[in-house]
């Protein structure tokens, strides 16, 4: 295979897929549903799917086509019905489960006599995708955040919602104010006043370890003491503290600033510490009993405190009381700002570090801490606040490089909290957690399983709570999992629900610090080894398991092989590909990946990349269909409760029904487009994004429809419909194929050290692998040894273009037409066309009608032969042999083995699009044929090449305005010489209605008809073959028995007396409809299956029309240059060439520059040269590899050659190449300027004026609105629209407008009266009210608005009264008047 003009089989994708289904896919599904139990679980249906067999179709292909049958085989499976109670087999037999439509050799299915095709579907591949959240707001700066480090003290409540402070501790400076009375500076510590927020932050800088657990524990006790004890004991405790603070002998009214300061500092700190709910959980009775033990243990551990036993007992009593009273304490509001206040940080920290009890040995302290911890653990004692063993962090403040100094003037204006917070932003130093996770982009992961609904995992902010009022609730963004619009919950909830512990989750997550604190903690009771969660998790929540557990269940969610491979590669997992369910590892990996994407700058997944899209071909669609059918069957059998009986096996029809439904009405099962061989071929190579599980065309974005770099060589960038499906329906390129996993591949030649290796098969690459290699395009020149000749080669690498040396190139594309689809590859010189026009060109080739006398194109691309072979519209030889006989109806070939193979030709058959399918033999008797050789030509195929149109002589010049705006002027030669003549075959379906009431039958004896009208019918009343029929002619004569009620009294009497059976009959014949004509070529009659008295059930009559080209038909070139014929000019009036040849077609020259489809000029000039030289050209696109402007050089060269060969110098004018002087046929004078003339390949499109022309005088009306129907099929009228109304209004044609709105449209009464008046020659009466207005009134009444009209009298009348007029019931057009009002004041508005 040279891959230049011989390419892989175009229909292989469909055929391979169906064969896979028959051999593998079917057994897979049958194995999945091998056992089905019924409702009672007593009966079991066992299917032996491995042993299935297919029974040969009852109809052959041709019979199925002709008689509207189905080409399908019965699928037979051995089935057992077992009774599990008595363990017996009730039924064991081969059972035909379904009838499966079979694919023909042309990759189509025959359903009800029509060829249908199952279009491949391109959908998102199963796997996981990460995308950035759209419309993400930047995070709110007022939002309080937890830091990662435990320097924010965290209070333990079972609900986990208390923190000591959200911010780092910071210290406003006090100011001194001069007090004139005491003649002394007075210190006002600002934490007392409301102005606490006015001040900026100073950071402490302290390195040594200066705090332990007991330091703060004592503060806590002191605070409790001051609240709970009597004033005497309170004083004692305070004195105790003052003793620690070296302030023993002083009273409270200190003169010394330092001491005031210190006490205030303590008070403030302790207020803050205690402003939380201390405990929620109630204490056990056991603890109350064991209080004494606790006290004794507590006293033993007093070595650390230099205090007497009494004081220690006091303290522990206080602690005890604290715990007991905690239940009664109301939950206090969190004070979100904790300020440690000091004047000179260094000085006061040293002062604090001198406290006696801090000078004790640290090691002892830790030991005691451990014992204290064990004690609390035993006694289920929950300390109110957790601390890290070293609180060094808390007092360690770093001065940043951008340290901002305190500016008093600026602070004067900070009045509100908001202003302060805004200013505070400048000074705040971010903690590790904030730095890591703050203000980053958020992502969402979407898991798409092969079976089951999509699962979304992503960040979601808890936005329902007002973060300013309730800073506790406004936690960090949580990672949530979402099954649908309603069901969602945090991932941690789900994992804990499934029984995982915090520790397991912590160890499995790479970014566990997002969810858990990662510093050593003093932790209470049983959760000693568990990490502390950052988020509020209600503990009682995990007892019940929700529907989210379903995602781990293969019956609800199945990733499939492809999904598992995709997830493994995306998340770097090493799971076995047999494990096709979602696992915990997947959830962990996805969560990690989400957080990783958040903190690292990475590109999100490109969902439009072809590595993330896969193709589901026929086989897989059918396999899914079987799965659905068997699921329905299982459900049905489970719901059946009646007794066991083999008759229950009838429920297997439900599988059959789902298959019929799919082939009959699915979006992917389409009526094959058989206009011409190309259209049928491209239809079978189409991939659609629509259909079940695909996109919804109304809600789809532009990105999905757009061309993507990964489409290169896989999906055609050109061929796609215009309109709402653009980009959603595409075509495979010429060389693309689908691999086992459903991903598209395209072939490349390997390049090693600058040499193209063209031995053997090319390498097929999928889109994701291709991104890692440097790939050169096909139009790079090579020498005869296949070495790349250029020094710098442009390559595609990671979806970008880079220039490299030949040695760096890894692969090279195999063909220049590898990029485009089959239809686009037929356009010569399409590299010179604008893409939009190339799109129109490739779409219009599919609409071209097969002509009576087709011609091969002079200028082609070399693919015409293969398209003709693969299209399935020709007969190809099955094996090598010798032709023994050829007739118009069959060809007989003798095989080498002596077998006689008979090929039946299709003669004048109707295609799905009413075009004519006709085989003409092109082999002769005695010829040796090879396997795969074409034996016959088909529609639009001449000598085994695709021939969609005609080579005609065209000129680009205006002619009297007849080619204005894409109109086309043609020569009458095209009509008389049948150049653009085509045959169309219409099928008329006549059904014989045989109800019990109306016995309808076909007959030639039709009452009250002229014998001339029935002379063309046979004895059964059916038209004879060969008759030419016109509108109104009878196709099938039918009579229907007259109803007895309509009979005359005499005939009724006769029937009553004699019991006469002979009823009267009336004519009910089927006649040709308006505008239809043609010759009857075949009639097909269908007999009833039951042996009833009457023969026919329905009759098909096939009528062929020969349609010559006429004004209004649409013709087009291959470059998107389409137009409507505006006038057929006699040949003597057409402009002619210097040698006297008149042109065939005149096109408008203005259609070229603005549309930029210059390829048509190259084509027509090369066609002219080919016509003169009697040569044909095969031009592959993208020919610049042979030199610059090579297309132009080739054409000039060939034109010059032709002018020399023919000795006609006018063919090539070196000053205006391609232009010739034309002579006007009417005057004989030359035209002023030379004109471009050439031989172009023009197509006649299926949009024929005969099918569009339509007229109506009277006809059917719509039932509700009573307006004329619309459309040709309903014999409808033309809508008189908004703009037409403007035209009448502009001319003031009021009566015309009124008529249009009433009697010509939907005023029923007026319509009838007008008709009456016209018939009787009377004056036309006044009009009534349009029906649509009445409908409007009814609609208004249905929403409770009563619309009525009132009659108001004249001004001069003295009487005043109102009369209600009902517009709908008692309406009389003549009596209705509107009088002027009697009194202006009576009119109420």
From Swiss-Prot:
Keywords associated with the record: Chloroplast, DNA-directed RNA polymerase, Nucleotidyltransferase, Plastid, Transcription, Transferase
One Gene Ontology CC term in the entry: DNA-directed RNA polymerase complex
Listed GO biological process terms: DNA-templated transcription
Catalytic activity: RNA(n) + a ribonucleoside 5'-triphosphate = RNA(n+1) + diphosphate
Subcellular location: Plastid, Chloroplast
Superkingdom classification of source: Eukaryota
InterPro entries, sorted: DNA-dir_RNA_pol_bsu_ext_1_sf, DNA-dir_RNA_pol_bsu_external_1, DNA-dir_RNA_pol_su2, DNA-dir_RNAP_su2_dom, DNA-dir_RNAP_su2_hyb_sf, RNA_pol_bsu_bac, RNA_pol_bsu_CS, RNA_pol_Rpb2_2
Pfam families: RNA_pol_Rpb2_2 (PF04561), RNA_pol_Rpb2_3 (PF04565), RNA_pol_Rpb2_45 (PF10385), RNA_pol_Rpb2_6 (PF00562), RNA_pol_Rpb2_7 (PF04560)
GO molecular function: DNA binding; DNA-directed RNA polymerase activity; ribonucleoside binding
E.C. number(s) listed in UniProt: 2.7.7.6
Coiled coil location: none
PROSITE patterns, per the entry: RNA_POL_BETA
Subunit structure: In plastids the minimal PEP RNA polymerase catalytic core is composed of four subunits: alpha, beta, beta', and beta''. When a (nuclear-encoded) sigma factor is associated with the core the holoenzyme is formed, which can initiate transcription.
Role summary: DNA-dependent RNA polymerase catalyzes the transcription of DNA into RNA using the four ribonucleoside triphosphates as substrates.
Family recorded in the similarity comment: Belongs to the RNA polymerase beta chain family.
Alphabetical list of NCBIfam families matching this protein: PRK00405.1
Protein name: DNA-directed RNA polymerase subunit beta
Organism: Phaeodactylum tricornutum (strain CCAP 1055/1)
């Amino acid at each position: 295979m040279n891959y230049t003009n011989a390419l892989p089989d175009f229909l292989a994708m469909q055929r391979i897929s169906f064969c896979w289904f028959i051999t593998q896919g079917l057994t897979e599904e049958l194995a999945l549903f091998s056992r089905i139990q019924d409702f009672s679980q007593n009966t079991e249906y066992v299917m032996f799917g491995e042993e299935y067999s297919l029974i040969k179709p009852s109809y052959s292909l041709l019979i199925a086509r002709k008689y509207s049958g189905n080409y399908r085989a019965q699928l037979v499976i051995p089935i057992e019905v077992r009774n599990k109670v008595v363990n017996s087999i009730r039924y064991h037999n081969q059972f035909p489960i379904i009838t499966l439509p079979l694919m023909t050799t042309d990759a189509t299915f025959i359903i009800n006599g029509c060829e249908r095709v199952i279009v491949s579907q391109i959908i998102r591949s199963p796997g996981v995708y990460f995308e950035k959240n759209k419309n993400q707001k930047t995070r709110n700066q007022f939002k309080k955040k937890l830091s990662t480090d435990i320097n924010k003290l965290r209070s333990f409540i079972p609900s986990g919602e208390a923190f000591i402070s959200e911010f780092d501790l910071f210290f406003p400076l006090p100011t001194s104010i001069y007090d004139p009375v005491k003649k002394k500076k007075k210190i006002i510590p600002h934490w007392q006043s409301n102005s606490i927020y006015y001040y900026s932050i100073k950071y402490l800088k302290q390195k040594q370890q200066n705090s332990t657990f007991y330091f703060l524990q004592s503060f806590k006790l002191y605070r409790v003491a001051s609240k709970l004890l009597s004033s005497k004991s309170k004083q004692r405790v305070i004195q105790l503290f003052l003793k620690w603070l070296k302030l023993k002998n002083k009273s409270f009214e200190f003169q010394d600033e330092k001491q005031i300061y210190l006490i205030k500092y303590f008070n403030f700190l302790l207020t803050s510490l205690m402003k939380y709910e201390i405990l929620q959980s109630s204490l056990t009775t056991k603890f109350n009993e064991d209080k004494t033990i606790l006290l004794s243990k507590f006293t033993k551990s007093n070595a650390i405190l230099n205090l007497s036993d009494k004081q220690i007992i006091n303290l522990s009593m206080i602690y005890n009381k604290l715990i007991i009273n905690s239940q009664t304490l109301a939950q206090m509001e969190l004070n979100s700002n904790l300020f440690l206040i000091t004047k000179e940080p260094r000085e006061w920290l040293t002062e604090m570090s001198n406290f006696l009890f801090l000078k004790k040995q640290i090691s002892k302290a830790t030991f005691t801490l451990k014992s204290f911890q064990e004690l609390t653990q035993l006694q289920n004692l929950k300390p109110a606040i957790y601390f890290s063993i070293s609180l060094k962090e808390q007092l360690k403040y770093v001065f940043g490089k951008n340290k901002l100094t305190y500016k008093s003037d600026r602070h004067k204006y900070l009045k509100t909290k908001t202003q302060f917070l805004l200013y505070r932003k400048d000074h705040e130093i971010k903690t590790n957690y904030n730095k890591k996770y703050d203000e980053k982009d958020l992502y969402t992961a979407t898991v798409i399983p092969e079976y089951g609904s999509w699962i979304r995992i992503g960040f979601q902010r808890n936005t329902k709570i007002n973060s300013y009022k309730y800073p506790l609730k406004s936690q960090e963004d949580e990672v949530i999992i979402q099954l649908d619009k309603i069901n969602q919950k945090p991932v941690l909830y789900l994992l804990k629900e499934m029984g995982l512990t915090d520790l397991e989750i912590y160890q499995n997550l790479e970014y566990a610090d997002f969810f858990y604190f990662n510093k050593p903690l003093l932790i209470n009771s049983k959760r000693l080894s568990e990490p502390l969660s950052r988020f509020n998790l209600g503990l009682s929540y995990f007892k019940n398991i929700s529907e989210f557990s379903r995602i781990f269940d293969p019956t609800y969610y199945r990733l499939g092989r492809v999904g598992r491979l995709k997830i493994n590669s995306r998340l770097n997992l090493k799971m076995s590909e047999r494990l096709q369910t979602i696992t915990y590892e997947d959830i962990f990996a996805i969560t990690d990946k989400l957080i990783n994407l958040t903190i690292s700058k990475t590109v999100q997944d490109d969902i439009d990349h072809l590595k993330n899209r896969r193709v589901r071909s026929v086989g897989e669609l059918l396999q899914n269909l079987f799965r659905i059918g068997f699921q329905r069957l299982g459900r049905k059998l489970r719901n059946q409760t009646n007794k066991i009986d083999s008759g229950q096996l009838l429920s297997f029809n439900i599988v059959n029904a789902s298959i019929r439904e799919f082939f009959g009405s699915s979006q992917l099962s389409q009526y094959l487009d058989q206009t011409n061989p190309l259209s049928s071929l491209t239809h079978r190579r189409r991939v659609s994004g629509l259909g079940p599980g695909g996109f919804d065309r109304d809600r789809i974005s532009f990105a999905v429809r757009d061309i993507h770099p990964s489409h290169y060589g896989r999906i055609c960038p050109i061929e796609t419909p215009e309109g709402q499906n653009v980009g959603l329906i595409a075509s495979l390129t010429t060389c693309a194929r689908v691999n086992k996993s459903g991903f598209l591949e395209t072939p490349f030649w390997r390049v090693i050290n600058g040499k193209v290796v063209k031995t053997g098969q090319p390498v097929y690459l999928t889109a994701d692998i291709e991104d890692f290699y440097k790939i050169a395009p096909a139009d790079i020149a090579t020498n005869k040894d296949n070495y790349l000749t250029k020094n710098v080669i442009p390559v595609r690498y990671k979806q970008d273009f880079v220039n490299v040396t030949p040695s760096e190139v890894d692969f090279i594309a195999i063909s220049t037409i590898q990029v485009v689809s089959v239809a686009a590859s037929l356009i010569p010189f399409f590299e010179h066309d604008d893409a939009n026009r190339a799109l129109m060109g490739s779409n219009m080739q599919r609409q071209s009608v097969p002509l009576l006398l087709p011609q091969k194109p002079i200028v082609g691309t070399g693919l015409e032969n293969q398209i003709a072979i693969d299209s399935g519209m020709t007969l190809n030889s099955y094996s090598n042999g010798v032709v023994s006989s050829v007739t118009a109806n069959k060809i007989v070939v003798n095989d080498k083995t002596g077998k006689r193979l008979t090929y039946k030709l299709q003669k004048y058959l109707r295609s799905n699009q009413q075009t004519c399918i006709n085989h003409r033999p092109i082999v002769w008797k005695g010829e040796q044929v090879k396997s795969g050789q074409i034996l016959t030509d088909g529609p639009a195929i001449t000598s085994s090449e695709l021939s969609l149109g005609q080579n005609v002589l065209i000129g680009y010049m205006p002619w009297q305005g007849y080619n204005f705006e894409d109109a086309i002027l043609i020569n009458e030669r095209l009509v008389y010489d049948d150049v653009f003549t085509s045959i169309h075959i219409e099928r008329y379906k006549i059904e014989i209605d045989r109800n019990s009431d109306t016995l309808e039958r076909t007959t030639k004896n039709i009452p009250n008809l002229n014998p001339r009208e029935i002379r063309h019918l046979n004895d059964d009343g059916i038209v004879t073959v060969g008759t030419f029929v016109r509108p109104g002619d009878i196709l099938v004569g039918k009579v229907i028995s007259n109803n007895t009620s309509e009979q005359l009294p005499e005939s009724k009497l006769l029937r009553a007396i004699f019991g006469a059976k002979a009823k009267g009959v009336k004519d009910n014949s089927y006649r040709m409809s308006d505008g239809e004509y043609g010759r009857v070529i075949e009639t097909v009659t269908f007999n009833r299956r039951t042996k009833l008295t009457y023969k026919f059930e329905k009759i098909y009559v096939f009528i062929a029309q020969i349609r010559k080209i006429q004004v209004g038909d649409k013709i087009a070139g291959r470059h998107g240059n389409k137009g409507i014929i505006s006038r057929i000019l006699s040949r003597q009036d057409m402009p002619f060439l210097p040698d006297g040849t008149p042109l065939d077609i005149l096109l408008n020259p203005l259609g070229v520059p603005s549309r930029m489809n210059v390829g048509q000029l190259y084509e027509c000039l090369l066609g002219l040269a080919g016509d003169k030289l009697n040569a044909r050209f095969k031009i592959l696109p993208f020919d610049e590899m042979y030199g610059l402007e090579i297309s132009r050089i080739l054409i000039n060269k060939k034109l010059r050659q032709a002018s020399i060969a023919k000795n006609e110098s006018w063919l090539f004018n070196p000053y205006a190449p391609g232009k010739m002087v034309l002579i006007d046929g009417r005057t004989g004078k030359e035209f002023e300027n030379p004109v471009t003339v050439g031989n172009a390949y023009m197509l006649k499109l299926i949009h024929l004026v005969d099918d569009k022309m339509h007229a109506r005088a009277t006809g059917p009306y719509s039932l509700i609105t009573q307006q004329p129907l619309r459309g040709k099929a309903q014999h409808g009228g033309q809508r008189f629209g908004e703009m037409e109304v403007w035209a009448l209004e502009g001319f003031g044609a009021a009566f015309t407008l009124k008529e249009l709105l009433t009697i010509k449209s939907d005023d029923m009464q007026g319509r009838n009266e007008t008709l009456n008046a016209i018939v009787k020659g009377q004056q036309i009466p006044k009009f009534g009210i349009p029906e649509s207005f009445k409908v409007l009134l009814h609609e208004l009444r249905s929403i409770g608005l009563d619309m009525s009209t009132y009659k108001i009298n004249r001004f001069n009348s003295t009487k005043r009264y109102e009369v209600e007029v009902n517009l709908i019931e008692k309406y009389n057009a003549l009596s209705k008047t509107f009088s002027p009002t009697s009194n202006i004041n009576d009119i109420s508005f």
